[in-house]
């Protein structure tokens, strides 16, 4: 039995999240079905984390054990032949130690959020972006982003259904970048609470759109009160960019 690590990318718009659900299409479900076609036996995959319904990934990490003798390049081609139509692609395969776990061995995770901040765009450019009509001040947004850096209790930006014992998370970096008609928010953290990034983005944008003070965001963060968080930004503009390992 060999353990294989796979880097995968996917369009989350067609799926009800990563984690398998009996009656709904999911990323995990599609990959496990593809593996079963090749292996002829059920294979369970493990991931670095579970993305929500509608969220995309540029480089999600999964592992699985396989007992057939097949070259990695041939396995990659076979999987992509099955998966590309449902919007999932295997980017890379490699062998790893049996002790490796994509979630527990992960050191950091990077997410990005794409904001379309221009009236000059084609309709399809908004499919994986959040359209904001008002011209945003990137300096104001970056002042709020700086407040996130460090170790904080993110109860305010957690979902009531999140079962994490601790709401403390360490944020290594958080910044907004202008990229043509888009503003991209990039955040790197040890890990994230359920819907945390989208709640943060929605709150920062609401404060900026309403011309409220930067200090409002810090007050909301420190309140540890979910009711003070603003609108949760939509999932279609969120990407899991990268998972970092030692």
From Swiss-Prot:
Substrate binds at residue 111. InterPro entries: PsdUridine_synth_cat_dom_sf, PsdUridine_synth_TruA, PsdUridine_synth_TruA_a/b_dom, PsdUridine_synth_TruA_C, TruA/RsuA/RluB/E/F_N. One of its GO terms (molecular function) is RNA binding. It is an enzyme of class 5 (isomerase). The active site is at 52 (nucleophile). SUPFAM superfamilies: Pseudouridine synthase (SSF55120). GO terms for biological process: tRNA pseudouridine synthesis. The keyword Transit peptide does not apply. Keywords: Isomerase, tRNA processing. Its EC number is 5.4.99.12. It catalyses: uridine(38/39/40) in tRNA = pseudouridine(38/39/40) in tRNA. The keyword Kinase does not apply. NCBIfam families: hisT_truA (TIGR00071). Formation of pseudouridine at positions 38, 39 and 40 in the anticodon stem and loop of transfer RNAs. Homodimer. Belongs to the tRNA pseudouridine synthase TruA family. This is tRNA pseudouridine synthase A. It comes from Borreliella afzelii (strain PKo) (Borrelia afzelii).
């Amino acid at each position: 039995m060999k353990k294989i690590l796979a880097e995968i990318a996917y369009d989350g718009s067609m799926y009800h999240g990563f984690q398998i659900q009996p009656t709904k299409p999911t990323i995990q479900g599609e990959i496990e079905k593809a593996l079963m076609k090749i292996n002829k036996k059920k294979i369970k995959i493990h991931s670095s984390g579970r993305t929500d319904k509608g969220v995309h990934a540029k480089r999600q990490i999964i592992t699985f054990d396989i007992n057939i003798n097949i070259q990695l390049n041939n396995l990659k081609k076979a999987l992509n032949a099955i998966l590309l139509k449902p919007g999932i692609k295997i980017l890379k395969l490699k062998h790893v130690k049996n002790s490796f776990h994509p979630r527990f061995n992960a050191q950091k995770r990077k997410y990005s959020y794409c904001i379309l901040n221009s009236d000059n765009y084609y309709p399809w450019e908004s499919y994986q972006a959040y359209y904001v009509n008002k011209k945003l001040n990137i300096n104001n947004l970056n002042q709020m982003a700086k407040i996130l850096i460090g170790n904080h209790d993110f109860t305010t930006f957690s979902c009531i259904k999140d079962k994490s014992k601790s709401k403390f998370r360490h944020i290594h970096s958080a910044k907004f970048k202008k990229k043509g008609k888009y503003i991209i928010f990039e955040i790197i953290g040890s890990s994230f609470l359920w819907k945390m990034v989208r709640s943060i983005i929605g709150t920062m944008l609401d404060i900026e759109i309403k011309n409220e003070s930067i200090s409002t965001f810090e007050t909301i963060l420190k309140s540890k009160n979910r009711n003070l968080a603003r609108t949760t930004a939509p999932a279609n503009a969120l990407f899991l960019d990268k998972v970092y390992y030692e």
